[in-house]
Amino acid sequence: KLTWLDKTFNSVSIIIFICLMIPQSFVLPVEKMKKSDYNQKSYWYYPWGKSGTHKGVDIFGKKGTNVVSPVRGFTFATGNGKHSGKYVIVLGPKLRFHYFAHLNSINTNVGNWKSLGEKTGTIGDSGNAIGKPAHLHYSIVSWLPHFWRIDNDPQGYRKMFFLNPIEFLNDCFKN
C-alpha cells in the first residue's frame, strides 16, 4: 500500500517530468528589438554592482516599449523591489523562470496565463536603474540545477541555475 509520502513523491515526479517534456518555443522579449540592443558579453559580467555578477542581459530600448513573454507560461510573481524595480516572473516550459526587471509598467497579474509574445510590461528605468538609460533586465533561471554548468568564474556555482539568455536571443536572430 502506498503511503501519503509515496503518493506525493510520485505525483510531484510526474508533474516535473511533464513540465520538462513540454517543448519550448521562444520569441524575443522586447517588441522590434535588434541584436544591437544588447551586449553579447554582458551575461555573467564581473564585477557588477551589489550583486557581484550580472546574471542576465540588459536589453536597451525606448521607455514604454512593450516587453512580451518570450515563452508560454504562468505569471508566477510581480512586484516592485529596491534593486529590480517593477518586475514580472513567468514560469515557462522546462521549469524555467523568466525574470523581467526595471519595468516602467506591469501588464499582468499573478496566475495569469501568458501566450507566446503576449505583453507583460514595458521597458523602464525603475529600481536601481533610475537615472540610467531605459532597459529590460532579462534573466532565465532553472528550477532544476544544471550541475555541469558550474565553473570557476566569480559565483560560478550559481550558473547551475542561471541560464545564458543571450544564447536564446541569438537563436531568434538566426531564423
Name each model feature, range by range.
Residues 2-86, 115-116, 125, 162-175:
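Surface-exposed, glycine-biased beta-strand/turn segments
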Residues 38, 43, 99-100, 138:
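Aromatic side chains
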Residues 57, 65, 98, 106, ...:
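Glycine-centered loop/turn positions within well-structured domains
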Residues 60, 91-93, 141:
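A generic structural motif
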Residues 69-107, 133-137:
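Zn2+-dependent peptidoglycan hydrolase active-site motif and core
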Residues 113-175:
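Conserved, short, structured surface segments that act as functional micro-motifs
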